[in-house]
């Protein structure tokens, strides 16, 4: 079973990563990352702010990040992706409290999609950046990052699928990031967990809760190491429960009553 998740806009490069006795890994697709960096370096703060719809302060920060980005990734300029991303998904995942065995399992069974890096293993080193997959960054391959990455992410995802040993892919990424995957080109049964929260008597997807729940589902996978879709249905973290009637063969619906 392989799970995929989105990255996060919020990053933490100040807090030291937990110390495990295995080495961090090198991101595989940095030759492509360098091409994107070279394009992004050409933007002024105002141009980048307009492209990314971000504040002047964030635009200036990311112009500096693009200028400082280096092809070589080491312990001084980088941090393992699993511990660098901080956002709602990663709050639910709570990577800092994973055991050594769970992190080892994650190295094989978890991947992060990325606008800049394409596909990251949990312990791949990464440098601070902001480049969302939906950014309309014109490049030699087309009008946006979906055109830039083409089949590359899908091919590397297939390699990861082959290495981990079965054909179950658990899609816990946002639609924006999953759009960079070409499911028809994957030899995989793709399972999509959906998390619904009760609001005024009706169950609906609430972005903040759904993101956190996706992280909790990753945590559940790393802790329980399920080998079948049936075992995923046992997920009950955060008071969610599996709704058999609302689910289908590849869409697993989890619900939670309104929080008091």
UniProtKB/Swiss-Prot annotation:
Q: What is this protein called?
A: UPF0246 protein APL_0602
Q: Which InterPro entries match?
A: YaaA (IPR005583)
Its GO CC terms are: cytosol
The transmembrane segments are none
Q: Where does this protein come from, organism-wise? A: Actinobacillus pleuropneumoniae serotype 5b (strain L20)
Provide the taxonomic classification: Bacteria, Pseudomonadati, Pseudomonadota, Gammaproteobacteria, Pasteurellales
Please give the biological process terms from Gene Ontology that the record holds: response to hydroperoxide
Name the family the entry cites. Answer: Belongs to the UPF0246 family.
